[in-house]
Curated annotation (Swiss-Prot):
Gene3D superfamilies: 3.30.2300.20, 3.30.70.2810, Vaccinia Virus protein VP39 (3.40.50.150). PANTHER family: RIBOSOMAL RNA LARGE SUBUNIT METHYLTRANSFERASE M, RIBOSOMAL RNA METHYLTRANSFERASE FTSJ DOMAIN-CONTAINING PROTEIN. Monomer. This is Ribosomal RNA large subunit methyltransferase M. Catalyzes the 2'-O-methylation at nucleotide C2498 in 23S rRNA.
Amino acid sequence: MINLFLYCRSGYEKECAAEIQHRAAELEIGGFVKTNKKDGYVIFQCFQAGDANILAQKIKLDSLIFARQMFAAKELLKNLPEHDRITPIMEALSDVRNAGELRVETPDTNEAKERTAFCRKFTVPLRQKLKNAGNLLKKENSSRPIIHVCFVASGTAYVGFSFSNNSSPYPMGIPRLKMASDAPSRSTLKLDEAFIHFIPEEEQEQRLSSGMNAVDLGACPGGWTYQLVRRGMFVAAVDNGPMDEGLMETGQVKHYQADGFRFEPPRKNIYWLVCDMIEKPSRVAELIEAWAINGWFKEAMFNLKLPMKSRYQDVSTILETMATVLEENEIKNFSIKCKHLYHDRDEVTVYLSLNPTQ
């Protein structure tokens, strides 16, 4: 494969492109980016055939901030005939054998959504043909590569594969979460997705358990507090604004009407710190650093609002500075991860663990 196809949020192609160029250069793999604003995807075309396979395997998807999903792809298939789109796709996938799953997708744009129904319908005959030809196993297998067919326009598609151990479990990298009817705001979905993304499923019961103590800085009206409460935690909600009455009636929330930047927890038994404040990202990062240096939490989830320009560079600098500050303050064992999640808008979610077990 010669191309690496990366899904991203529409409008963030430039950031995704800058990131993959940087990461490919670290592996000494040459290539160039092809993308258009609002496409919802980025193509990194390698100078050498086969290098895309290396990138798809060696660059961990979870380590990329702006890519939701990626796969190694052949050259763009154009002008697929309406009477037989399957044959050219089969020919392009001839060297992919015994894959475990097929995903026929589109980028996440309003225009592309018009092709969603076609993709669902087209999946059925294509899947059967791939099974008959040996490209796809008779039964789905989560340990085998995933075949991707992405229609970027009518009759135009990129085809390829991703490695199952370095791929999003969700089509196009988008988890479908339901908005709870009693949640105070849609921001609740951001923290819900963050917990699902950053905390392995087999560890969630232990690390997101009932009875834990948490602090939510900038809590009003309680979207993030809601996710902590529904997992059985006791929450110190810090905000000068009002909190949702339903949350307060649970008895699990204590509301501190205070400035989140000046608040100090009265008890130092906090496990989770969460923060979603509309503030300069560098200032929020400095606040989290101060809490970490004081040892006021074990795990933290916080959002950084993004500037309009140089977003990738600014986020990278903030994360690098945070790591340096923690090390300079004798915090040696920590883990920082960052992702532009589906439910994030002009922001990224950062996860910080002190003394991680892995």
